[in-house]
């Protein structure tokens, strides 16, 4: 009785059936049922466990939903007061920390205009890093806050227009209450964050903030990853503009840069696998291979994962991380270049400087370089982010740079909860262990070093704006790869972990999997 129904409806129905409005529901939406490659596992109707297509895995197993209810049993902790001592002072600090307060007010969408000003806002399927100041402002965080959030009419959006994950004081989630062309955008759908606004906005050269909010709603209702969905729409538009597909292919939809109605129509067909949408539902990489005739050159993805809205052309360490990351291009697998510059470390020694030093990073690098010092930064922050994933904590609360709390505080919380002394060094080892296990899994499945590469478009000069002419330097990129393999303890020929690396991490049991 739940198959084929939208996520909001399924969640409400299941909560009513178990008699608990506070019950949480994990589910695949209709897109997961239809095995859309980038279907996500949804919770709270508007939270997506995105990327990698886990919603399609649920759909393939005919598993529609899992309902979880809390009990009255208190969580046992070794040192509850130790946890409080670390966490409670952070709550009033939210307003005092400019980085975190902007996140609380605008969500991640608060960075869209600055990304554009730096020439780092992917535009027209990564052909440019700039869509103009006025057009970026039209889809940015300040406008969303002032006009689209619930409560904006009464100037009460700080209270009514934000949501939070359980027990979080930052409250970075948006609640949009608006319309697009007479179609209601339900507050239950949340609201667009930076990635979603970029992929349905600048990627497609669209500056209609209401259309973007509606696209976000569709993705949440059908249960898909917004990055993959929006980037695939941009790929399709690019193909149409280049004459690789026509309205005959798209079922009469005349795609084009800046055409919001056509983009929404194509998205709807993709989420339901109708017509040409069935091709796009495989994601841009498979769609490009299917179309051929040069369409492959318009795909902007690594290991099948579409690139997020952080550009390696202006954040060089991401060129490396996107390439080597086991599940493809991901912007939340390491810290970004602007957070490790000599100027920033000098200006903020007590925050950025200390948190870098906690990871053993004492040689800050200019934003634009990709040298050995930057590779070390990328690798060590990759270990830190990997550890945070292992601990299942939010990367907007804990982290190695701008976040509310640093890795030292995370180690302290884990120590207080478990009673087992944990240091930052321990966390980096845990992160390295996870990363090497992921890499070994890929190797067993036949994914080789040849997949540690970047799409053709990143090596082509950007067009327009502050980043005009910039491109990933292929020689510099290849040299950084070699340095990374050496620092990570991976074989430079196969790209796989060396036997001694696995042994040092307590992963010797994986050696037979890699024929070591």
PLM ranges: what are they?
Residues 1-21:
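Well-ordered mid-protein domain cores that form the structural environment of catalytic cofactors
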Residues 15-18, 22-52, 58-516:
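Extended C-terminal regions of large enzymes
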């Amino acid at each position: 009785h739940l198959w084929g129904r939208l996520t909001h409806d399924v969640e409400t129905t299941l909560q009513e059936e178990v008699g608990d409005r506070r019950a949480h529901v994990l589910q695949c939406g209709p897109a997961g049922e239809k095995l859309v490659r980038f279907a996500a596992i949804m919770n709270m109707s508007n939270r997506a466990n995105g990327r990698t297509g886990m919603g399609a895995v649920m759909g393939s197993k005919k598993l529609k939903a899992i309902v979880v209810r809390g009990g009255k049993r208190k969580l046992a902790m070794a040192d509850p007061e130790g946890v409080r001592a670390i966490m409670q002072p952070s709550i009033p600090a939210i307003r005092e920390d400019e980085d975190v307060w902007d996140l609380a007010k605008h969500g991640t969408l608060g960075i869209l205009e600055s990304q554009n000003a730096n020439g780092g806002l992917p535009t027209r399927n990564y052909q440019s890093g700039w869509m103009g100041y006025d057009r970026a402002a039209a889809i940015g965080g300040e406008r969303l806050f002032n006009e689209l959030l619930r409560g904006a009419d009464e100037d009460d959006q700080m209270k009514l227009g934000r949501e939070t994950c359980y027990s979080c004081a930052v409250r970075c989630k948006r609640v949009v209450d608006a319309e697009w062309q007479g179609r209601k955008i339900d507050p239950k759908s949340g609201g667009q964050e930076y990635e979603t606004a970029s992929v349905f906005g600048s990627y497609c050269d669209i500056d209609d903030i209401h259309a973007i909010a509606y696209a976000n709603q569709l993705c949440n209702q059908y249960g898909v990853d917004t990055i993959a969905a929006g980037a695939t729409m941009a790929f399709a538009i690019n193909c149409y503009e280049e004459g690789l597909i026509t309205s005959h292919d798209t079922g009469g939809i005349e795609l084009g840069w800046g055409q919001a109605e056509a983009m929404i129509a194509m998205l709807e067909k993709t989420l339901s696998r109708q017509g040409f949408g069935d091709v796009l539902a495989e994601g841009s990489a498979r769609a490009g291979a299917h179309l051929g005739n040069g369409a492959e050159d318009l795909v902007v993805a690594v290991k099948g994962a579409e690139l997020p809205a952080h550009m390696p052309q202006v954040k060089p360490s991401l060129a490396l991380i996107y390439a080597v990351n086991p599940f493809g291009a991901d912007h939340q697998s390491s810290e970004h270049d602007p957070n490790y510059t000599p100027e920033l470390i000098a200006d903020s020694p007590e925050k950025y400087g200390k948190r870098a030093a906690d990871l053993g990073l004492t040689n800050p690098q200019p934003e634009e370089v990709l040298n050995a010092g930057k590779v070390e930064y990328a690798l060590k922050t990759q270990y830190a982010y990997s550890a945070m994933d292992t601990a299942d904590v939010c990367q907007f609360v804990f982290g190695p740079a701008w976040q509310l709390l640093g890795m030292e505080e995370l180690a302290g919380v884990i120590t207080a909860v478990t009673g087992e002394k944990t240091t930052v060094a321990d966390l980096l080892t845990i992160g390295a262990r996870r990363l090497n296990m992921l890499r070994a899994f890929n190797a067993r499945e036949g994914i080789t070093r040849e997949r540690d590469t970047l799409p053709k478009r990143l090596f082509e000069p950007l067009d327009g704006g502050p980043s005009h002419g910039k491109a990933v330097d292929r020689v510099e990129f290849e040299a950084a790869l070699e340095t990374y393999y050496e620092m990570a303890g991976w074989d430079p020929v196969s790209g796989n972990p060396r036997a001694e690396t696995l042994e040092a991490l307590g992963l010797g049991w994986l050696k037979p999997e890699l024929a070591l």
